[in-house]
Structures are given as C-alpha cells and as structure tokens.
Amino acid sequence: MLLPLACLHGRVAQCLTSLLVLAEPFPRPRRGAKARGAAPTSAEPAPAVAKMAAELYPPASPSAATATDIANSNAAGAAESTKVGLCCPPCLAPAPLPPLPAPPLPDNNNPESPNWQSFHPTLRERNALMFNNELMADVHFIVGALGAARRVPAHKYVLAVGSSVFYAMFYGDLAEVKSEIHIPDVEPAAFLVLLKYMYSDEIDLEADTVLATLYAAKKYIVPALAKACVNFLETSLEAKNACVLLSQSRLFEEPELTQRCWEVIDAQAEMALRSEGFCEIDRQTLEIIVTREALNTKEAVVFEAVLNWAEAECKRQGLPVTPHNKRHVLGRALYLVRIPTMTLEEFANGAAQSDILTLEETHNIFLWYTAAKKPLLDFPLTKRKGLAPQRCHRFQSSAYRSNQWRYRGRCDSIQFAVDRRVFIAGLGLYGSSSGKAEYSVKIELKRLGMVLAQNLTKFVSDGSSNTFPVWFEHPVQVEQDTFYTASAVLDGSELSYFGQEGMTEVQCGKVAFQFQCSSDSTNGTGVQGGQIPELIFYA
C-alpha cells in the first residue's frame, strides 16, 4: 500500500533526525535476512548509542527532569497519535530522543564562572564585583590591631587611581614590594568602607564606625568620603555626643564640624556637660570647653562636670579616685572653672564640700563672698556671657477687642519649620489686655505627634501688648526642613491681646521660619492671627 506523500516526508525527516542523534548506524541485517523476510528494527538504540547519549546528556536537576518528562510524554503522545492516524509501519517509527539538558542559570555573583562579565554591563558594576574579592587580587592588607586583624584582598590599580597615598605606595619611587601590607591603626570595618567607595563609589556609613572611617579617609586622602563622614556626623549631632565629636573634629581638623559642635554645646550646655561623652574627651578639649565664654549654663554645672571627668580620667590611668588624684589629672583645668561666679548657696552646698579644693582655697572663696576686703583668688571672677536668645515674631501687629481674645483652657497651636538647625528655648505669649493678670500655662513642642519638651508653669502679664516669655526646661534641638508643632494651653479669665496680619515666612537673622496652621489648635490660633506670637530660640 502506498503511503501519502505528507506522511512519507514526515517519516523521512524523523528518521534522518534519529540518524543524526545516534552515534552509530543501525546494525546491518545478517546475510539471508531478506530471504527470510526479516527487517531491521529501530525501536531500541544499540547499547553503545545509549551509553554515548548518557555521556552527552547527563541527568538534569529534579525540577528540570520533571519538565523534561512532561515534554517527552507530550512528544510520545503526539507520536502515538501520528502512528495511529497515519498507520505508519513499525519500521519507520523513530527512536526515542534523549532528554534535552536544562539551560544553566546565570550566576551573577560568581566572577569565577565563565563569561561573568556579561552579567555586569557597566564599568562600575564590574569594578564593584572586584571589591573584597580574591580574583586577580595582587595585594593583601592585614588590617586591625594584633588579635583582631583581618586579611583583605585588593587590586593595586584600583587603589592607586582612587588615592594618592596608595599611588605612592604601589607606583612611587619608594613603592611597596611586599605582597602583604600591615595596617594596625585602621579598623577592619572602616577599611572595608574605604575600599568599597574606591571600587564602586558607594558610601555605606554607620554610627559605630563613622569616626574610624573618617580617620581612614583622612589617612589615605580620599576627600569625598571624608566629606560624607562629616555630613553624617553633623546629621547625627546632638547634646549627648557633641563633646566627643568636638574632640574628634579638632583631631581631624574639620572646622565646619567643630562649629556645628559648638552650636550644640553652647545652646544645650547643661545636657552636653552631663552626658557620658563629656567624660571621654581629652584634657585639652576639656580645657577649651571650660574656658568657653558662650556656655549657656550655671557654673555649678560646669564644676560638677569637671569632677566627673576627673573621676573617669583617674580610672583610665589606673589611679585611685581620691581628691589628690583628681587635682593631679585636672591640672590647670581646675583653675579655669569660674567658682566665684556661683551663688554663695551653690558654692557652700557644692564646691566647698567636694574636698577637691584646699582648705585655704575654700576659706578665701568664702571671704570673697562675704568680706569687704576680698582676697586674691586663682579662679576667674567674671561670669560667662552665655548666649543671647533670639525671637521670631510672626505677626505684624497686635490688637484687643471687647469680646475677644480669651484664654479658656483650650489649645492654641501653630506649626513651623526652619531652614537650618536651631534650638527652641521657649515661647512668647500675649497676656491680659485689661491690666495685670496671672496665667497658668502649659507649653509643648512636638514633632510628628511625639512630645519633645513641655513645661507647666505660670507667668504674670502687666496689661501691655508686649509678649511674655515662657521657657522650656532645656532648649530643644530642631532640625531643618521638618515641621514642628508649638502649643500653649492657658487658663485665665481675662481678655487678652491677639496677633493679626500673620506671615507665613519670617527671616530672623540667618534663620528662615515657615508657618502653617495646626490641627491641634482649638482656640482659633492660625497663621493669620491668634496667640503664640513668638518663638524664642538660639542659633
């Protein structure tokens, strides 16, 4: 019976495919096979063919094998359907094809895999892949102190391109020829941050290592990384770490950071001097702080801070904490404290009982307070100037009317933002418009609903349209470009003045203030009019 032409062409193509896949030809029929009518079968490949197919196509992974099995079963079903539908003779049935191998998954993180460069199309990506990588490394660093050192691979060319120090080290007249270089004065984590930046331009700073990273950036003259470290420190600067950062900024010769530290220390002197960080500074920095004219705190606080530092220094030096040893470690710093500017009560209850002063010094200071003929003292006699508070007034005029404005225990509130860091010391409030009056007041400062500071106190107004200051216990640090909410709740029956012609933006010296209405305000205060006419701040 003749086969249809389409069936014949399909079977010929399948047989050719089978011949191409198989590594050996079909076995020839034995002599006389034709006479007996036997035909060669191709249903099973020869053992050698099966073996070669197994070598060429090793077993795939389970997931790939599952997919291959499904494909083979579909192919087998299709072949069976073709065989039944076309009634092809068994002699033309193709041999089963070996399973196709699963495509390899790209390994983007393994530079040792073939053609890894293809997965990183940009120069920056390829360079970043070489960071902390042994591949092609031609130098190694032993970084850190003995016992905590770490071996770091690197590439001379990359380091020399990013740092003049490394260039001189590897390609200068006195180039280093050793394959391992010891760096005991740099922390391993900081050194890796340095190298990561040099390989990829990525800066990965953390609070625990930023100072060590700044040291490394300074040592190897990488100014962009050093600048990023300084910016990070300025952002995280607050009273509890300002003294430590002041010490470090002087060490690294960073005048901008030094100035930012002084702004915090001056405005929040009491909090800064009572912080744990103050006890960690060196003696030279201690002397500089104690001589500071702008410290905005009482001298009794300065004296207490100096004693705390002396106790910590005795422990650092392994000395017993005694009055004698405290005087020894303080040296001339003790005589920079302006003890005579304390009140008599502060001196009698504090410095006079500290045992760090000699009996003669204590006697002479008491005489200086009380006697008409005052003895000579070795301590400064002039009081510190401190900081002069600034006031941001947001109304162009004030007024009063017979039926308003009245404090009724409701909240007057306004939101504000600044374009640089300031320290809010208090609020200026309007008082009675009908004579002298006393008010109970609660002032509050919030950020994103969180209370940063509050104070419950009283103030007396004299009947004028002047504003009356109400202070927080400590100045509150306010960061730029963030809205804060200032609120006041006053309890009083007298009519009061109120502001009008309010401004949305006010420039106070170097600081620009921006105001907007607050949803907390329930007594009518807003941008255009109402209470809280002033913000009192240091900058």
Curated annotation (Swiss-Prot):
UniProt cross-references to SUPFAM superfamilies, sorted A to Z: POZ domain (SSF54695)
InterPro entries assigned to the protein according to its UniProt record, in alphabetical order: BACK, BTB/POZ_dom, BTB_POZ_BTBD6, PHR, PHR_sf, SKP1/BTB/POZ_sf
Gene Ontology cellular component terms for the protein in this record: cytoplasm
Subcellular locations according to the entry: Cytoplasm
CDD domains reported in the protein's UniProt record: BACK_BTBD6 (cd18525), BTB_POZ_BTBD6 (cd18349)
Residue ranges of every copy of the BTB domain listed in the record: 137-207
Pfam families, sorted: BACK (PF07707), BTB (PF00651), PHR (PF08005)
Primary localization: cytoplasm
Signal peptide (from-to): 1-23
Keyword vocabulary terms for this entry: Cytoplasm, Signal
Summary of the function given for this chain in its UniProt record: Adapter protein for the cul3 E3 ubiquitin-protein ligase complex. Involved in late neuronal development and muscle formation.
Stated name of the protein: BTB/POZ domain-containing protein 6
Protein's organism: Mus musculus (Mouse)
